[in-house]
């Protein structure tokens, strides 16, 4: 049953790929592409910076770091006590 469904989908995708790009999707000249690279990189860097700052602020304002430190401290102390009682 899956084969009957996947074959028509494969045929449609293959037809779309072989058809080629639409006129509006035609590749621009290589020189204009190279001219836009610095702007695109700057835009990417700014976007990445904004997202990183937002993520760091979210982490700073959340309780997760404090809870994690507390959990690790408690677990470490429990293991330490168990080892003390086991080897004394």
Curated annotation (Swiss-Prot):
Biological process terms in GO annotation: lipid transport; lipoprotein metabolic process; negative regulation of cholesterol transport; negative regulation of lipid catabolic process; negative regulation of very-low-density lipoprotein particle clearance; triglyceride metabolic process; very-low-density lipoprotein particle clearance
Would I find Cytoplasm among this entry's keywords?
no
Q: Which UniProt keywords apply?
A: Lipid transport, Secreted, Signal, Transport, VLDL
Q: What would be one Pfam family of this protein?
A: ApoC-I
Gene Ontology molecular-function annotations: fatty acid binding; phospholipase inhibitor activity
Q: Which family does it belong to?
A: Belongs to the apolipoprotein C1 family.
Protein name per Swiss-Prot or TrEMBL: Apolipoprotein C-I
């Amino acid at each position: 049953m899956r084969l009957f469904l996947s074959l028509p989908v494969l045929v449609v995708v293959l037809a779309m790929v072989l058809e080629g790009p639409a006129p509006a999707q035609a590749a621009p000249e290589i020189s204009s592409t190279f001219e836009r690279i610095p702007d695109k990189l700057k835009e990417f860097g700014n976007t990445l910076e904004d997202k990183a700052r937002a993520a760091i602020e979210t982490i700073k304002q959340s309780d997760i770091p404090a809870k994690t430190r507390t959990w690790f401290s408690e677990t470490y102390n429990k293991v330490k006590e168990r080892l003390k009682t086991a080897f004394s």
